[in-house]
Amino acid sequence: MVTIRADEISNIIRERIEQYNREVKIVNTGTVLQVGDGIARIHGLDEVMAGELVEFEEGTIGIALNLESNNVGVVLMGDGLTIQEGSSVKATGRIAQIPVSEAYLGRVINALAKPIDGRGEISASESRLIESPAPGIISRRSVYEPLQTGLIAIDSMIPIGRGQRELIIGDRQTGKAAVATDTILNQKGQNVVCVYVAIGQKASSVAQVVTTFQERGAMEYTIVVAETADSPATLQYLAPYTGAALAEYFMYRERHTSIIYDDLSKQAQAYRQMSLLLRRPPGREAYPGDVFYLHSRLLERAAKLSSPLGEGSMTALPIVETQSGDVSAYIPTNVISITDGQIFLSADLFNAGIRPAINVGISVSRVGSAAQIKAMKQVAGKSKLELAQFAELEAFAQFASDLDKATQNQLARGQRLRELLKQSQAAPLTVEEQIVTIYTGANGYLDPLEIGQVKKFLVQLRTYLKTNKPQLQEIISSTKTFTEEVEALLKEAIPEQIELFLLQEQT
């Protein structure tokens, strides 16, 4: 028979008591009352904060947006098909944040910063809040460096500076995304990090943009954040903030960044859907009352930082789609009032074969010539006025039968100026090439040519100057001014090339 030793038993009990670790954990929980259409109503969660992340029993994450007296309205970051009525929900005590690092360059990610390009996980040691406060007044300085888009019409007449917010607005299929993607292609070698945010786009068009970037070597300095048309409204609403958080990470590390939101109309629609399902009162065009704040807090994050903060910059190029040219609708007027200018793309110009279809008359940059190098100011200073006068004269000339010689000359000059602003897609020009092109048109050298010959001649002229007069490019890029030496070189080269071109065309 086994003998029971009292001292041994007491030792074991004592050891167990010493090892006992009482862990007290307070968890803020609730139960699902109702779920559907990407919205869940939760009973409980008494201590939850506005904007806090909550986790459902089966792993779905949501954001608490509506805090009501008897329930909490949560928007889901997923389809929520496996969430059941009565299942439990717990508050996480965190607000939405994403990992950030250099490793994101060249990758395609979703609004939660998870890779969707099939190239494995992205390593990151730091994280940033998706919603960060914008830099204050003291943290900023005025915009003074140009961000070259490679498009003559923009860089000469509607210049964009680093740290500016310039709206690209127009009807569907007028080339808005083409202007934005060309700007990204033109940043090659400029040490600018680009972020392209696709909101509610077709997956095929996002894939096309990514392919273009890869073929042109632009992906190495670009991050693509994509939430396509089949994504939940919550993720389409979050995508721009995710892009802004990534761009901010580089801006605060003394880098220049450029971010494109394509497009904010779809983000506003996603937010409207969420708000109406949460039963928030609708306002104008059924958008909620805080839709202005939705965009202002996003676009205010673009800035040119002051010297103590390292002079980094974040340039925002939001895109907004209009319905049959109506710029006075709710979202377009909101975004126009927030940004520092707009580039208006016209369907009529696009259909008339003027591409990029920029309506120079009503497009404006509120930073102006501060965002141009001196050489461009010297050459293109009067271009916008001349084109506006030409457009007015052209409209008037339709009703007049016999025009005097001076008017005919002005019309001919204007037509050639408009012709030199035409550019093929994905063919950005360097600032030196743009200066030469504008100088040629503004000084009447193109007048002897037929309108149809202008584009062909300019290509030939640029090629000739690149190979035979490389010092021209060197002088402009080193001095940033249009010197007398440059003008002398052009006065000699352009007439020669025009003679040669006209002889070639005759044969």
Swiss-Prot record:
Q: One matching Pfam family, short form?
A: ATP-synt_ab_N
Keyword annotations for this protein, in alphabetical order, are: ATP synthesis, ATP-binding, CF(1), Chloroplast, Hydrogen ion transport, Ion transport, Membrane, Nucleotide-binding, Plastid, Thylakoid, Translocase, Transport
Q: List the disulfide bonds.
A: none
Q: Where is this site: Required for activity?
A: 363
The UniProt GO MF terms for this protein read:
ADP binding; ATP binding; proton-transporting ATP synthase activity, rotational mechanism
Q: Where does ATP bind?
A: 170-177
Name a GO CC annotation attached to this entry.
proton-transporting ATP synthase complex
| Top EC class, one word | translocase
EC number of this enzyme: 7.1.2.2
Q: How does it sit in the membrane?
A: Peripheral membrane protein
Q: Where in the cell is it found?
A: Plastid, Chloroplast thylakoid membrane
Where is it chiefly localized?
plastid
Q: Which reaction does it catalyse?
A: ATP + H2O + 4 H(+)(in) = ADP + phosphate + 5 H(+)(out)
**Similarity comment: family membership:** Belongs to the ATPase alpha/beta chains family.
Spell out the PANTHER family in the cross-references.
ATP SYNTHASE SUBUNIT ALPHA, MITOCHONDRIAL (PTHR48082:SF2)
Supply the NCBIfam families for this chain.
atpA (TIGR00962), PRK13343.1 (NF009884)
According to its UniProt entry, what is the function of this protein? Produces ATP from ADP in the presence of a proton gradient across the membrane. The alpha chain is a regulatory subunit.
Q: How does it assemble?
A: F-type ATPases have 2 components, CF(1) - the catalytic core - and CF(0) - the membrane proton channel. CF(1) has five subunits: alpha(3), beta(3), gamma(1), delta(1), epsilon(1). CF(0) has four main subunits: a, b, b' and c.
Q: What is this protein called?
A: ATP synthase subunit alpha, chloroplastic
Give the organism's phylogenetic lineage: Eukaryota, Viridiplantae, Streptophyta, Embryophyta, Tracheophyta
